[in-house]
Amino acid sequence: MSIVKTGGRVAIVLPDNVLTDGGATAKVREKLLKDFNLHTILRLPTGIFYAGGVKTNVLFFEKGKPTEDIWVYDYRTGVKHTMATKPMTRENLNEFVECYCTGHTQDRKETYSTENPNGRWRKFSKEEIDEAYEKNTGVLIA
């Protein structure tokens, strides 16, 4: 994270525990939320990059200002891919790419709501993020 210049953009694949565990990962998470704008998390199905059972996310962030809102796209719930028999393809992420609105983040619209609980695209405020970590609920990746 230290080599990223102000305004630099990063996308990185990390296991869930980086977003939830204490100790060293908690310090990394705190620095990420304070020194970077972690604006998007793409939750991937289990076993896409690592051994079976390992849950992963793609984190998208920019260096410069602290995190205010995090948009989460849940591509994990109800989806199963395997590297051997049913690999994930670019087409599987078309809805995410559409929701992401590259260059037009102000145009993002949630697809998740109480009326549409199957929607995959949801925004969490800084207050919701802080509360989730204080209560250790894992709301962003549960």
Task: Tell me the role of every PLM-derived stretch.
Residues M1-A142:
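A conserved structural/catalytic subdomain of Rossmann-like adenosyl-cofactor enzymes
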